[in-house]
Amino acid sequence: NQTSPLILSFGVSDPVGAIGIQADLATFSAFGCHGLSVTTGLLISDTARVEDVQAVDPDWVSDQARVLLEDMSVSAIKIGALGSVENVTAIAEIISDYPNVPLILDPFISALPEQGMDDEDILTAVRQLLIPQTTLLVLSPVELERLAETWRDADPDDTLQNDVDYLVALGCEYVLVTGMPAD
């Protein structure tokens, strides 16, 4: 019998363990929870930088998540780096089946190498498909600025508060902006 809360984490596999599912599982354990994981991508990285990311096939992501969710009742779902637009879509479909499970979205936007147009497409998909289902969105000011570029042009009148208000209007219950603004 499982007595500690189960938390399902979607994220990349980081060989250093600084981000991704390895870090999530360690954090969950430190707080008395048991972590379940679905790998969305594989990193090539060291302690100084992330060199590359290889997305896991979205069918694998979906199948692994469904197997876990059909077997165990989770107390929360945490989503980290996603790896591809297809993974965003697959995960959005899965979590839509669990609207009463709190969803924490911490997409590690600034931790991964930029992927050109794919990067913009991933951010747009996150905004359109995941943020409306999110209980708590966690972003740094730099990540918030990058995400905001998917819905607005750079404007000196735009503020962090305006961007947060926009995300809440999309349906996100809470937005936590960590650290200090870049300005």
Predicted segment positions?
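Conserved N-terminal subdomain of the carbohydrate kinase-like
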Residues: Q2-S9, A23-L112
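Conserved phosphate/ATP/ADP-binding segment of small-molecule kinases
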Residues: E120-D183
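Conserved phosphate-binding/catalytic loop of the ribokinase/pfkB sugar-kinase fold
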Residues: D57-W60, A111-I131
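Short, well-ordered, mixed-charge alpha-helical segments that flank or form enzyme active sites
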Residues: E86, A111-G116, E145-L147, D183
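Short glycine-enriched, charge-decorated loop/helix-capping segments at active-site entrances
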Residues: R49-A55, Q115-E120, T150-A154
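Glycine- and other small-residue-rich loops at beta-strand/loop junctions that grip anionic moieties
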Residues: S13, I79-G80, Q115, T178
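Short, glycine-rich nucleotide/cofactor-binding loops
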Residues: G11-A18
